[in-house]
Amino acid sequence: LNGVYYYRRKSYKLEGGVSMGRHGTIAGRKAAQDSKRAALFTKYAKAITVAAKDGGDPEYNAGLRVAIEKAKAISMPNDNITRAIKKGTGELEGVSYEELSFEGYGAGGVAFIVDCLTDNTNRTTSFVKSSFDKHGGNVGTPGCVSYMFSRKGVLLIERTDEINEDDIMEAALEAGADDIVSDEESFTVYTDPSVYPDVHKALTDAGYTFIESDVEFVPSVDSTPSENDIPKLRKLIDVLEDNDDIQKVHTNCAIDLYE
């Protein structure tokens, strides 16, 4: 693959035709979501279809339940959600998708992990490689940056006057969360990936809503780029996130790249 490496995590046969590690401001995250809503519909539909391979009833499929709730949070139409489920359960004809991850560096040595879900690995590999090359980065070998991250469930909740810090802490910890970090804008709940769906459900049932929630690569080592590198990093993230094959982009950048 001309020096570009990726590792395959799982393949899916779909019947039918997604870092939050650095949140930035709540306003910045909301603005990013709004500007990419159409692309998010496509990405979330893929995620729902993949999750539905393990069963089309969200009551008994925690992964599907979470995927549906995330789609509803961005106002994805119910028809789109239903169609995506049917593609996963085999009620509609389908295509094959494969889940890939790429590791590499952006401008200034910022570490990137890019999660993909694609029906054409050559197309996606070429796109990711060229995107990094054009914006001052490079794709590396598996493991070249993943050692700087830990995989965790992350649930971001906006701080409001109606939310009591003790209540949310109690609800999260009782559901199995590992840690809760708060600041003037938000609460961030961290979980082991294995209990993420349970914590997500418990907090949803308790009436909390999420700005974002997912299983993330959370950086344990930060990278602070120069001012000259920040525009290149932001452009690279924009280019990657605008592509339907890219489900999630994780970085260890200490600077908010969504402002």
List where the protein language model places each region.
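N-terminal cationic and glycine-rich segments that engage phosphates or anionic surfaces
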Residues: G16-S131, G136-G140, V145-V154, T224
